[in-house]
Amino acid sequence: MTKYVGIRGHRGSGKISIAYLIANTIEYLMDFKNVGEDFDNLYKSWCNELMKDEQNAVYNIDTPHVYLESFGDLPKMLTEMLTNIPHEYIYSDYYKDHVFINIRTMEYIEMDDNEISNFDHDLWKSQDLIEFVEEYGFGEFDSYWISLREFILYYAKTTSKYLGNDIWVKLMRVSEERDNAMQERYNIFGKGDKYKLFVDLKAVSEVTYVKERNGFIIKINRPRNIKEKGFDNLENDTRYDYELNIEGSLYD
């Protein structure tokens, strides 16, 4: 049986860190659920060891029973296909803010903060570029430079505009049905429960996808985090089962 969990929160709120902790906690509970009265002390000791590995706390989320999913991976895959930018760049916060793409030619360059400040061309935001192109087209300039982060948003928003805001949900559904068929055919997961952990829910349709599968939603609040607007506004969507108010870091 597949169980669904969704995490929502603004950029910088700690969604990936929480996902990592949830995934590994589920594994721990499944491995040590019969340890009896020593469970609390064993769990605390395990958490202390887990938090020591900073690299894993960011990148190692998939575990034997928990699989990470993200609707945001689909436009990232499109970006990788269009630009030939290395896969690891597209999933790195540093490179997303320091790699810039000329939309006219699809060439890309990496710049440090000083080079960004002294760059000879305007650097566009995704929404500004969408509105400009709608009104004037691409004909006015030879180059339109945009950060990798904004490039991903640009194509995600443009695709959603013409194919519908739920296009990424539809693609996820097709992908999941295909994966489930393969897993059943080859018994990839074996018997027992498995979990799909959806990180970074941004759209109403994405929350609906998890809830329709009897999943639960975790909303993360973190003071002073960087706010970002998704394809749909989740501020008025009250469909969450748990709310976490976070201060400090994962290690706190």
Regions found by a protein language model. Name each.
Residues 15:
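Conserved lysine of the Walker
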Residues 36-194:
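ATP-dependent small-molecule kinase phosphotransfer cores
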Residues 22, 79, 172, 207-210:
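Hydrophobic packing residues within well-ordered alpha-helices of enzyme cores
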Residues 6-11, 20, 36, 42-43, ...:
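Small-molecule kinase domains that catalyze NTP-dependent phosphoryl transfer to phosphate-bearing small molecules
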Residues 197-203:
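Switch II (G3) loop of P-loop NTPases
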Residues 66, 196, 214-218:
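Hydrophobic anchor at the start of a short beta-strand
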Residues 4-6, 197:
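Short hydrophobic/aromatic beta-strand immediately N-terminal to the Walker A/P-loop
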Residues 22, 26, 30, 83:
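Active-site catalytic pocket residues across diverse enzymes, especially alpha/beta-hydrolases
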